[in-house]
Amino acid sequence: MTKSELTAKMQENAAYLPGKTVKLDFGGEGTILMDGKNETVTEDAGEADTTIKISWEDWQAMAAGQLDGMTAFMTGKLKVEGDMSNAMQLQGVLSKLR
């Protein structure tokens, strides 16, 4: 799945946290902004309440259920900046994509 396909699937499935903004930062692969305030998912690099830094490959593994979010965090594959509670709620968002 490409980042554009993922963005479209996330928008279609309302894969965002209501009232919150979370940015997925894939480094050189770009970003996805889940804007629960405006109920949109875009490839914008705007400001967010929480920024999740993870490689595109590791994100794909998490989305497929092959990599646990807590394991990714504990091993340094996933880094969180900002409101940690939003990051903790992302499992629910991921379940909308399976």
Q: Which residue ranges define each predicted feature?
A:
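Feature captures hydrophobic
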Residues: 1-98
